[in-house]
Amino acid sequence: MITNTKLDPIETASVDELQALQTQRLKWTLKHAYENVPMYRRKFDAAGVHPDDFRELSDLRKFPCTTKQDLRDNYPFDTFAVPMEQVVRIHASSGTTGKPTVVGYTQNDIDNWANIVARSLRAAGGSPKDKIHVAYGYGLFTGGLGAHYGAERLGATVIPMSGGQTEKQAQLIRDFQPDMIMVTPSYCLNLIEELERQLGGDASGCSLRVGVFGAEPWTQAMRKEIERRLGITALDIYGLSEVMGPGVAMECLETTDGPTIWEDHFYPEIVNPHDGTPLADGEHGELLFTTLTKEALPVIRYRTRDLTRLLPGTARTMRRMDRISGRSDDMLIIRGVNVFPSQLEEEIVKFEHLSPHYQLEVNRRGHLDSLSVKVELKESSLTLTHEQRCQVCHQLRHRIKSMVGISTDVMIVNCGSIPRSEGKACRVFDLRNIVGA
């Protein structure tokens, strides 16, 4: 049963009604992109397809995919489908290599985005009565402003904290008594540690009721850790700058069974990450999105590199996405074995003495790749003897070996030894190219 505030009619429309709207909007998007973005005209022509070839949803697979490299190759503004005078805001991705991915928004795009994030917050149980602490970074990154304008559109009171200043953030959470927090899960763990320090222990009695977490993958075990230590319901919000920003999909409070994709604005597909072959709902693969209402920067079959599967709707008509299991481009191949950081995190957080703060380092020793895992002890476990620490190391090595089939070096360090992130956590250091240079 839906328990939160009034839903948008499309959230509970019939599947036929939703698909009719998607078909109508896809026809517009394909035509808009083809007529206004030279890159798309070239790609469609090279593939021998035209927007008129799209008549039903299954026809979308005839059209070529778009990649991050396509957007970078047309840096900065050649992918914009409207004149610059209609672009009211520019964001850029936080990529660490190459040129950033530039995203433009018309006023219509901004309004749609605010409405989508407001809908997401309603799905999380938010209302105009709430105070919402936004700890996503503000600036070119879409997280802070996307969350901010959505919370304002909801009618809530926004606390625009941004990232960083952890001690001050924790103090203001105590002083301002917010009901909801929007933040990356890794930075939330930093805030929890600081709250516990300031409170002299347990932080689960603070005012926060719900946390909306996104911008990086996180495991079910990390969710439970956050919920236990902060006394909240932790929900998953999904988004990416190239498609819109936060709010592409949102987990619903009444089911907490995977983010519902707002399919009236974003059309999802799953493909084989190796050859792009379309996969059926329920099969694991790479997630693609086509925007349905984006004016300034429409994207057609955009390859997110996120690995997941599509699931039937539960609380709403629209389909859900399973929790992201990893990224096809972040996957580590070590001695021919595919390893995802999320797999290792699942094992780490099962240990009662280990915290969720860890780093992975991949090196090359001669001609052989090696994986090292550095993980912090919980503060409550600092009294472990050397022998007990060695035993935990041995157990974690054994768990990882059983799971992925390769041996690892495990180092346990005291709490606070691993640098804390104020945004997305940087957990993987692949030094193979550096060593071989």
Curated annotation (Swiss-Prot):
Matching SUPFAM superfamilies: Acetyl-CoA synthetase-like
Alphabetic keyword roster: ATP-binding, Ligase, Nucleotide-binding
InterPro entries to which the protein is assigned, alphabetical: Adenylate-forming_Reductase (IPR051414), AMP-bd_C_sf (IPR045851), AMP-dep_Lig_C (IPR028154), AMP-dep_synth/lig_dom (IPR000873), ANL_N_sf (IPR042099), PA_CoA_lig_proteobact_actino (IPR049623), PA_CoA_ligase (IPR011880)
Coiled-coil regions listed: none
Pfam family name, one: AMP-binding
Pathway info: Aromatic compound metabolism; phenylacetate degradation
Expression induction or repression: Activated by cAMP receptor protein (CRP), integration host factor (IHF) and by phenylacetyl-coenzyme A that prevents PaaX from binding its target sequences. Inhibited by PaaX.
Enzyme Commission (EC) number: 6.2.1.30
Any one GO BP annotation for this protein: phenylacetate catabolic process
Top EC class for this record: ligase
Catalysed transformations (reactions): 2-phenylacetate + ATP + CoA = phenylacetyl-CoA + AMP + diphosphate
Gene3D superfamilies noted in UniProt: 3.30.300.30, N-terminal domain of ligase-like
Molecular function terms, GO-annotated: ATP binding; CoA-ligase activity; phenylacetate-CoA ligase activity
Similarity-based family: Belongs to the phenylacetyl-CoA ligase family.
Entry function: Catalyzes the activation of phenylacetic acid (PA) to phenylacetyl-CoA (PA-CoA).
Subunit and interaction comment: Monomer.
Designated name of the protein: Phenylacetate-coenzyme A ligase
Encoding gene (name): paaK
